[in-house]
Amino acid sequence: MRAEAAAHANHRSTALGSSFYLGMRTLPPVQREAIFQIYSFCRQVDDIADSDEPREHRLAALQQWRDHIDALYQCVPPPRLKDYLASVTTFGLKREDFLAVVDGMEMDVLQDIRAPKMATLDLYCDRVASAVGRMSVRVFGLSEEDGIALAHHLGRALQLTNILRDIDEDAGLGRLYIPRESLDHAGITSSDPHKVIADKALPKACAPLAQRAMMHFAESDEIMNCNPRRIVRAPTIMSKCYRAILDLLLIRGFAAPREPVRVTNLTKRAILFRYALML
């Protein structure tokens, strides 16, 4: 029990401070622990992708995660995944979704993503965000059809919001996730992250991505509105927190210099108060 308690505390501490934590904390204990585990896994592989280790070291570390996931699904999990076994069994979490997340992180490691084609960006979003959603909706208890659809739309909405929020931070890592089609639309021919983020036409390049995010938010709202409120309480809170980020980005705009945007604690509390009591 002591080891299980320590693992729970570790998963919870990983989630603290994230925009998802407000939604996680509204879940019943068993569901909450499963979501903490999923989030902790995602953070660990994301930290590998974003580290300054040589590419070959990061690729090896991601491959080790694949091996450990395979071991988990053979019911012989390594120590760091031992407490995941109950969640995998209870909620039917799929091996391919865990592996898809690792594949998404590998896309960042193989080469710095710069001005990808929209289809490539969509694949990236599916792997690093919607695959997480496909695991999460099983924990929330949505039906298969609605769960897959919600994961598709909300995962992409959240990831596109991340991309728009983190333009400058990503450029510092040598990455540029704004798709080539959007850059072409704005007349930006360069794929150099630092040149693009300084270009006066950047707001025009960001506009289609923001519109796409809003479309996915609208689609996910429609799905959640058709489901019992108690089931979609957590994803609703997550969605509202991220939609607040997108709204702040749209108000601020994307012209340089860009001040970071943050949802205030007051706004977060208002969202939690409004949606945590959904029955």
Curated annotation (Swiss-Prot):
Give a single Pfam family match. SQS_PSY
SUPFAM superfamilies, A to Z: Terpenoid synthases
Catalytic activity from the UniProt record: 2 (2E,6E)-farnesyl diphosphate = presqualene diphosphate + diphosphate
Class of the enzyme per the UniProt entry, highest EC level: transferase
Its EC number(s): 2.5.1.103
Q: Copy the pathway line from the protein's UniProt record.
A: Secondary metabolite biosynthesis; hopanoid biosynthesis
Q: Which InterPro entries match?
A: Isoprenoid_synthase_dom_sf (IPR008949), SQ_synth_HpnD-like (IPR017828), Squ/phyt_synthse (IPR002060), Squalene/phytoene_synthase_CS (IPR019845), Trans_IPPS_bact-type (IPR044843), Trans_IPPS_HH (IPR033904)
Q: Provide a Gene Ontology MF annotation, just one.
A: geranylgeranyl diphosphate synthase activity
Question: What's this protein's name?
Answer: Presqualene diphosphate synthase
Family per UniProt?
Answer: Belongs to the phytoene/squalene synthase family. HpnD subfamily.
Please describe what this protein does.
Involved in the biosynthesis of the hopanoid precursor squalene (SQ) from farnesyl diphosphate (FPP). Catalyzes the first step, the formation of presqualene diphosphate (PSPP) from two molecules of FPP.
Q: Which organism is it from?
A: Sinorhizobium fredii (strain NBRC 101917 / NGR234)
Give the GO terms filed under biological process for this record: carotenoid biosynthetic process
